[in-house]
Amino acid sequence: MAGFKRGYDGKIAGLYDLDKTLGRGHFAVVKLARHVFTGEKVAVKVIDKTKLDTLATGHLFQEVRCMKLVQHPNIVRLYEVIDTQTKLYLILELGDGGDMFDYIMKHEEGLNEDLAKKYFAQIVHAISYCHKLHVVHRDLKPENVVFFEKQGLVKLTDFGFSNKFQPGKKLTTSCGSLAYSAPEILLGDEYDAPAVDIWSLGVILFMLVCGQPPFQEANDSETLTMIMDCKYTVPPRVSAGCRDLITRMLQRDPKRRASLEEIESHPWLQGVDPSPATKYNIPLVSYKNLSEEEHNSIIQRMVLGDIADRDAIVEALETNRYNHITATYFLLAERILREKQEKEIQTRSASPSNIKAQFRQSWPTKIDVPQDLEDDLTATPLSHATVPQSPARAGDSVLNGHRSKGLCDPAKKDELPELAGPALSTVPPASLKPAASGRKCLFRVEEDEEEDEEDKKPVSLSTQVVLRRKPSVTNRLTSRKSAPVLNQIFEEGESDDEFDMDENLPPKLSRLKMNIASPGTVHKRYHRRKSQGRGSSCSSSETSDDDSESRRRLDKDSGLAYSWHRRDSSEGPPGSEGDGGGQSKPSGGGGVDKASPGEQGTGGSGQGGSGGTPSGTAGSSRRCAGPDSSSSSPASAAPRGAELVQSLKLVSLCLGSQLHGAKYILDPQKALLSSVKVQERSTWKMCISAPGPGPSADLDPVRTKKLRNNVLQLPLCEKTISVNIQRSRKEGLLCASSPASCCHVI
């Protein structure tokens, strides 16, 4: 203890930082302090021993002994005792809600009985615990009951007049406060220890429900007279049960007063938890309440913090010391328990409405697909392409208010083919029907203009395979209306500096999920996007009629061909060079012209771009091929709409091929489709158009089906490709009805 015996100079031996004063007494002052090692706030009762006489000194050490003895969740905990030559420091648990007297004074007519019952039951529970240990408080009053708002508890404090008693043996010391003291103490007679606390409990309950003390007159003499005569008036608003309990406790004759057992079993106190504190272990009354892992973790932190070695810590705990070692241990332990309790409360209090609010805030930029939604999808996702489920979105209630149309009618699920292993069998277009309107949709923007067009009848489409990827963090300022909905690949955690990686290592593809979307749902998405617009360079009046006609021909044959163009990460922004030539490349690079096929603009840098299209009339940036656009390639018969499935599955083929060390995405010797231009591995762009007849129409169906199945069996690698999907020249199958509806996926 030699290290602790320093004078008071704002700090206690460097162990506590003292702050403002919380209260003062005759011989003591209570200060707010911070435990230096743990950072926890505590209350420090500083007692000046030079002002104490022999009797007061005896009471002081009696208080310390009693507080060491009583360790209860409804009693303020004593952490440490620091004794110096002139002062005694008691390190106590800090209450955050003030005392009960101030709380009662804020309610002139008292608390409602339900709340009063809750607090009074906790006080009775604490006093009952003390009496079982043969400790009498002798100074029960609202000023010595402290609120702990974060824990929802009240706790007893100030055991300065407490003492040990033996059952059947009376005490003689007169102590306490006049307005709350029992008549026998004021008379100076011998008294039964538990009975004086029962009287004080009656006064506290009266104040809780009435808002004022039962015995309070103009002066102490009149107050003493009222106490001796036991005269008080209970307001008529107090219930009969509460009135009866008060009367049972405020009895002039101690032998007629109710015992603690009778109080606890009184009808008015039934139906209330006597101590909610028993549900938690804060404050921790024993180190044995901790798990072995938590116990060892705390000891390890103390050893590393040079508080003491392991043997000294264990010895201090086992001998129930009240020194800095045990104080540090219990403060650390209570922090762990408090954090655990807060997590449990947050988990229980997480309501669906709160989850919805968080979901809406993140809607415009990041669209998460909870794992629970897999049952609502018409295709079983690949085992390696899952999305981790967030606890905030674990419930089905997350979807309420955000989805109103479905991907698949549950009644139609039985019509889907069985999936065996990782392979996905080809689903014929006729096997899927438009989604039912009552089913919830996976992605839907809640906007009024979208709701107005939901009554449009969907047109049957072929089955489409959709790859979704979360958006890059660099695109978080994208407006809601321009947020991608379908046929897109999103990436989570993508940053701009990832594109500076080696060309053989494209940016990391974090998570992919393959699902089959309902044709009706797809059609509705594109129809709504027509009304929203996407900042296009094509007016909606130019193509609206043709687009409507193309939607009516969706079930007819469509010409599809597949062309692949290399696109480097250094590619410039749209319209950076050329006369409205759209997306361009620096001189010498493989530029790609994004003008429409019919109005080919200056592609990239013109003569410098090895991959650019021949220059022609200047076109607008990001132009789409309209139905009336002319084409240099003759149109002819093409594969059915089901070939659209194959086109998107080629994306998986490219992903799978990234696993191999070959230089090319597709082996030139084994390419099945002559329309697939073999390029070196890099970031890729896919265009679906109908420039002319494709030899894919003559492919062997068996080989084609085998190719599809093999594509879906290829595992996805940790790399990515960039896919740009453009609609066909005549059909507009992948686009909205508005002219500038290219689905740019970067």
Curated annotation (Swiss-Prot):
Basic and acidic residues composition bias: residue spans: 549-558
Tissue: Ubiquitously expressed in all tissues examined with highest levels in the brain and testis. Strongly expressed in the pyramidal and granule neurons of the hippocampus and also in the cerebellum.
Residue list for modification Phosphoserine: 162, 362, 390, 482, 495, 518
Compositional bias annotation for Low complexity: 533-542, 615-638
Cofactor: Mg(2+)
Biased composition (Basic residues): 522-532
Domain Protein kinase: 16-269
Catalytic activity: L-seryl-[protein] + ATP = O-phospho-L-seryl-[protein] + ADP + H(+); L-threonyl-[protein] + ATP = O-phospho-L-threonyl-[protein] + ADP + H(+)
Modified sites of kind Omega-N-methylarginine: 534
Name listed for the protein in its UniProt record: SNF-related serine/threonine-protein kinase
